């Protein structure tokens, strides 16, 4: 199992080559990249985007790091989901991800609308949405990771349930699309933000080996989507590791920690901080391996 982390802020601060070298020196073997096609100034809008992707992959791989996972853009309103030009951005994201060498591209479900009371309509939209992506997954040889979400209550402003934020719905989404190219990406930190009786380990066991192929690993205090490193919040990492081992999880251990855990540090401390984050990941992976079927 590769241990991986989101590289965006490190690349922004230090460039791709040094960013990859920093995480390699910290014990990581892979990284995750955000494909920011939702920004007008994104490099991926260049006519040379294929060469840019190939060159970026070569640069990162030269430091011993693989790009195993990407994240599709998600800052858009629900009423844009079926616009042809908008859908093309997601197809292009899959193409870029494939050139980069990624195995999974995480694509948020459509959830930019009020969820409670509209669950079935949102479900129908999302099943259609993911099924439309399947032929392109096949073309580019990449899987789409469906992520469990949360949202703010329209009136109270408190965190509430959203798409795939319960075990039965998450399982239903994956099974309804029914494609080897559409898998689950469990965001550990999102699970307990709503008043959820199911914990991350329950999601892991329910999704099981065949559905769960990707992770967004981070911690929080159940009050905000803090994206802390493990053991700095309230999640039960021993139970998470146990469950991942029990299902013989074969994906990567991929951090999605907050940019400020990197951005706010003096440059002199970056290397040591990354080694600390790497040590946490290695420890949890060792616990996963200890719980695999014998």
Predicted regions span which residues?
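N-terminal small/glycine-rich loop or linker at the start of catalytic domains
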Residues: 1-6, 68-77
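Histidine-acidic metal/acid-base catalytic patches
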Residues: 1-4, 9-29, 61, 87, ...
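Active-site-proximal loop/turn and secondary-structure-junction residues that shape catalytic pockets
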Residues: 9-11, 35-39, 73-76, 109-113, ...
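Short beta-strand segments at enzyme active-site cores
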Residues: 32-33, 67-72, 103-109, 144-148, ...
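Glycine-rich, proline-tolerant flexible connector loops at the mouths of alpha/beta enzymes
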Residues: 32-57
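Metal-dependent catalytic neighborhoods of phosphoester/phosphodiester hydrolases
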Residues: 42-50, 79-84, 116, 264-265
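Short glycine-enriched, charge-decorated loop/helix-capping segments at active-site entrances
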Residues: 43-47, 84, 159-160, 227-231
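Active-site acidic/histidine proton-transfer and metal-coordination neighborhood
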Residues: 55, 59-62, 78-186, 193-194
């Amino acid at each position: 199992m590769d241990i991986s982390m989101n590289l965006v802020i490190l690349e922004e601060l230090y460039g791709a080559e040094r960013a990859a070298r920093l995480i390699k020196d910290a014990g990581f073997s892979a990284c995750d990249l955000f494909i920011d096609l939702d920004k007008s100034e994104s490099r991926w809008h260049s006519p040379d985007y294929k060469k840019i992707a190939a060159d970026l992959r070569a640069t990162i791989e030269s430091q011993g790091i693989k790009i195993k996972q990407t994240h599709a853009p998600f800052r858009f309103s629900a009423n844009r989901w079926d616009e042809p030009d908008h859908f093309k951005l997601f197809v292009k994201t899959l193409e870029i991800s494939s050139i980069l060498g990624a195995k999974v591209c995480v694509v948020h479900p459509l959830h930019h609308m009020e969820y409670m009371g509209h669950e079935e309509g949102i479900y129908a939209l999302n099943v259609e949405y993911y099924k439309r992506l399947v032929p392109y997954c096949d073309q580019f040889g990449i899987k789409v990771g469906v992520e469990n979400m949360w949202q703010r209550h329209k009136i109270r402003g408190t965190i509430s349930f959203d798409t795939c934020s319960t075990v039965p719905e998450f399982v239903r989404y994956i099974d309804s699309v029914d494609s080897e190219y559409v898998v689950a990406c469990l965001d550990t930190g999102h699970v307990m933000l709503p008043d959820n009786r199911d914990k991350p380990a329950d999601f892991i066991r329910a999704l099981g080996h065949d559905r769960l192929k990707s992770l967004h690993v981070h911690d929080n205090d159940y009050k905000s989507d803090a994206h802390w490193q493990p053991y700095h919040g309230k999640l039960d990492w021993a139970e998470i590791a146990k469950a991942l081992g029990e299902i013989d999880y074969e994906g990567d251990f991929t951090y999605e920690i907050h940019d400020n855990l990197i951005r706010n540090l003096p440059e002199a401390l970056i290397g040591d901080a990354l080694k600390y984050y790497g040590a946490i990941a290695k420890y949890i992976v060792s616990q996963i391996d200890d719980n695999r079927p014998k």
